[in-house]
Amino acid sequence: MSVGVPVNPSSSSQLPAAPTTTTRRRVADSQEDHSHVNTVGGGNAVVYVPDEEETATSCCGGGGGGGSLSCCPSGSHHNYLVGFLSLRKFRLVWMLMVENKSKWTAGIARNMRSTTNLGRFILTLLSILVVTFFLIVALSGGVGRRRKHVEKHEFVVSIHPRPTIEKIIREDESSNSFQVLVPKTTSIPEIWNQPEVGNYQKCVARPKNQRPIKQTNGYLLVHANGGLNQMRTGICDMVAIAKIMNATLVLPFLDHSSFWSDPSSFKDIFDWKHFIKVLAEDVNIVEYLPQEFASIKPLEKNPVSWSKSSYYRNSISKLLKKHKVIVFNHTDSRLANNSPPPSIQRLRCRANYEALRYSEDIENLSNVLSSRLRENNEPYLALHLRYEKDMLAFTGCNHSLSNEESIDLEKMRFSIPHWKEKVINGTERRLEGNCPMTPREAAVFLKAMGFPSTTNIYIVAGKIYGQNSMTAFHEEFPNVFFHNTLATEEELSTIKPYQNRLAALDYNLALESDIFAYTYDGNMAKAVQGHRRFEGFRKTINPDRQRFVRLIDRLDAGLISWEDFSSKVKKMHQHRIGAPYLRQPGKAGMSPKLEENFYANPLPGCVCDTSEEQTGLNRFERPSLRAQSLR
């Protein structure tokens, strides 16, 4: 298996090839074409713009002539002659400038009365003449060298006439014509533009008056539950809770019994030494429970979900002081989104975005693969295509699947006791916008949004469910990659058997992508989009699934044209690209579960308006409502 080959069984398309060569040269059509220098063929390319006189007199009247002594040579000879005459003209200007400066210097020298000053001026004059001599020699040899470079394609001299000539010149395609390197992509489509971020920047600095860590009230053991991203955000909450209770946090235990059955430890996935070091001024973190407490039976406790800080400061802290060791068997969503004080909110972000760094082998491979996706300076899209068996079974979504596949999902749903919903109408759920997009729907969505078919797409997901589910996607976008097609077997050898380590790799590639899009609001989508907001509101597309599925159903029924469909899709998503907006607390009586997740949008809390009118605590607690206009 070769590295970096798109996983399209019906296509041999690979990452975009290097720029191709052609013998066609375009003459500018407008003054705008000459407002800047266009380079081709890399950093060594040169563009030269001649005067109108040079363009008009480059041929001697009538025909082009066919002999070797023709007044209007063809192909590359024409360009060499113009280049030589232009450089000669430039050299004559230099000589006139030197002559004028010499006369000026000599006149001053004659007026000098002091022999000492006269000697200094003579020395200066000689220095100027020596430098000028070397410049003339260097310019005299330039044409020959340029011709050699052109023959080697090291750089190209392109002759662009003035905009009064409005035609396309085709170079003689004989063996003597020179080749101009033309980049494959001449402009970046508008779809790759990033959102407007205003004056918002990350702000997670510790308070200047932060008190030093007190003597610990006890030790907190935590068993993080769920998939990687659910465990990740849960661990960040545990750091904040340990701070609230003045507890010493023991390195968390990871879930080994969930659907993924991954035996990886915290040290296998995260850089644990970095984690402890970054948070050293905030919370005491130890690798193991001290020996003197190992024999103590810990108090097991499942904290109440979405609890306020006061719950831990008052109720749980008392239990910690009494028992000295407490175990939390669940860590997901145990701290409220909006009520913790600003210092605790910033601590949650320091833990998530600064302290929790993946292990060295995962980080290194992530860098290699992201560079591989960006070969030839092409951007790439990371698509979280959550069309996996566990998600489809849990949600009851079976649109476009066969009857056998639907039965298979239903069996899985009934076999897992803690999944409460068993009988689900998948059709109704899809129309409500509560199903992940199918691969075909995702492809149509991306095409309607304006992504070209040559887009490099990295699929952030495990195994896509359903026979031939990706066929329609590959037909629209052939340059599709998964971790196992982008990396070699050797590169994946240390992480491939472990689902959480693969999820960490996907997380980094999604975080670093030029655009991230997700087809379902799962834990990874929340974690990645929040991290991208923190890192400068990198473009993140959040499809409006409810409106989109109704629109694509109309398209499939022939009730709407493709042009109208694409226009409507773009319009409905123009404000769903990851621009800043304030996370709003839930209304009275609303379940905290329905609020926007803190880690999906850390504004306010960890992102601040740095404009002049926003200062002091106001920057942290009351971010400018200007962000609402950017939503």
Curated annotation (Swiss-Prot):
Compositionally biased intervals (Low complexity): 1-13
Phenotypic consequence of gene deletion: Cell dissociation, spontaneous breakage and ectopic organ fusion. Affected embryo development. Increased arabinosyl and decreased galactosyl residues content in the cell wall.
GO cellular component: Golgi apparatus; Golgi membrane
Basic and acidic residues composition-biased segments: 26-36
InterPro entries to which the protein is assigned, alphabetical: FucosylTrfase_pln (IPR024709), GDP-Fuc_O-FucTrfase (IPR019378)
Disordered as annotated region, ranges: 1-36
Similarity field: Belongs to the glycosyltransferase GT106 family.
Summary of the function given for this chain in its UniProt record: Glycosyltransferase required for normal cell adhesion and cell wall integrity.
Protein name as annotated: Protein FRIABLE 1
